[in-house]
């Protein structure tokens, strides 16, 4: 038995969907523990591309129980669209469960999200505009509407009338926008309630029962460590806790129930939206990474900013999450490069900094690089470490050494089979993967 958390070790978009999909084969239960439709993961199976925002990747395995936990915020309209999309592809959703205590995103949340971002002007934070922040704000203010409220028509009507009237004041007075008609929203969401009702349960009991029965549980995080509300690059963060500790709160399990934490990181770095990005490449090389990596957001379609691998934020993710191992994705994107740089430290006001700094200092960081040779040949066909070009293997060893954590999985493309499993990241021995000892890495002057 193993209870495993999968988290993003960068700014999100690391390829967690594919890794979770691979690991779901060994899982009895997959739990999404935070975030909402601001996250998106793409899974490719037999040439079919699935873009999901709320439903866990494990839905592709009919014997795997998939849970949307209480720490998430759910947009019912989007969730139903995903259910319909899966049905068209012949994927059963009978194994999907929705926590009755998860909060619900309303139309006014989306409108307020976009209006507030517009009002920030030059201080905008790069929100997706999907209403996530305002939904979590209502949760914190204890005025939010939960799934269990959605399931009771009388309660929903009472709460929505009050909520809509309250939000209309904000929309009209602060943002100069027209008010909502409570009756229209009530009618719309009562329809959603009937569609989702068969999936709604007390998920904390389901998860507790799975733990008691020693079933394999996979906790799936959205976004990434550097977008964490408390530990990320504030204020350019999300409104929840994607870090491993968030799994306990968002799923309703004790910390002693977690056996292993797996971090997912690209072989380079990307970021969407605003905020400092020390290793960002704004030249043709950045465009090359964007084109080869198809770096456009699953949720917003926005172009991602691209840069070299940043081991400083990587080590920070290892520390904050207690990572046991790493999955490195999109190694194949680097196949055409003559040389590859890795940020090993920062220079801040003339001083070397090897630890992740506070937000004010982070905005002044200049990267300090180590340069490694590229391999200039395709890797997407490789299925073992022995198949990799020596320079590619050296690059992975260097990342593992500088991050001080072993690499368990290497992804070389979007398809399931384009993967090297170094060792079973769920059942394999902890910290016994690549590399076992420091590895000398040739460098280009």
Swiss-Prot record:
Residue positions of the active site: 13 (proton acceptor), 41 (proton donor)
Pathway(s): Purine metabolism; AMP biosynthesis via de novo pathway; AMP from IMP: step 1/2
Origin: domain of life: Bacteria
Binding site residues for Mg(2+): 13, 40
Annotated IMP binding sites: 13-16, 38-41, 128, 142, 223, 238, 302
Keywords, sorted A to Z: Cytoplasm, GTP-binding, Ligase, Magnesium, Metal-binding, Nucleotide-binding, Purine biosynthesis
GO cellular component, one term: cytoplasm
Cofactor: Mg(2+)
Residues that hold substrate according to the record: 298-304
One Gene Ontology MF term: adenylosuccinate synthase activity
Places the protein is found: Cytoplasm
Note accompanying the cofactor annotation: Binds 1 Mg(2+) ion per subunit.
Residue sites binding GTP per the record: 12-18, 40-42, 304, 330-332, 411-413
GO biological process terms on file: 'de novo' AMP biosynthetic process; IMP metabolic process
SMART domains per the UniProt record, alphabetical: Adenylsucc_synt
EC number annotated for this UniProt entry: 6.3.4.4
Record field: catalytic activity: IMP + L-aspartate + GTP = N(6)-(1,2-dicarboxyethyl)-AMP + GDP + phosphate + 2 H(+)
PROSITE patterns linked: ADENYLOSUCCIN_SYN_1 (PS01266), ADENYLOSUCCIN_SYN_2 (PS00513)
HAMAP family, per the entry: Adenylosucc_synth
Family label: Belongs to the adenylosuccinate synthetase family.
Purpose: Plays an important role in the de novo pathway of purine nucleotide biosynthesis. Catalyzes the first committed step in the biosynthesis of AMP from IMP.
Subunit structure: Homodimer.
Record's protein name: Adenylosuccinate synthetase
Name of the coding gene: purA
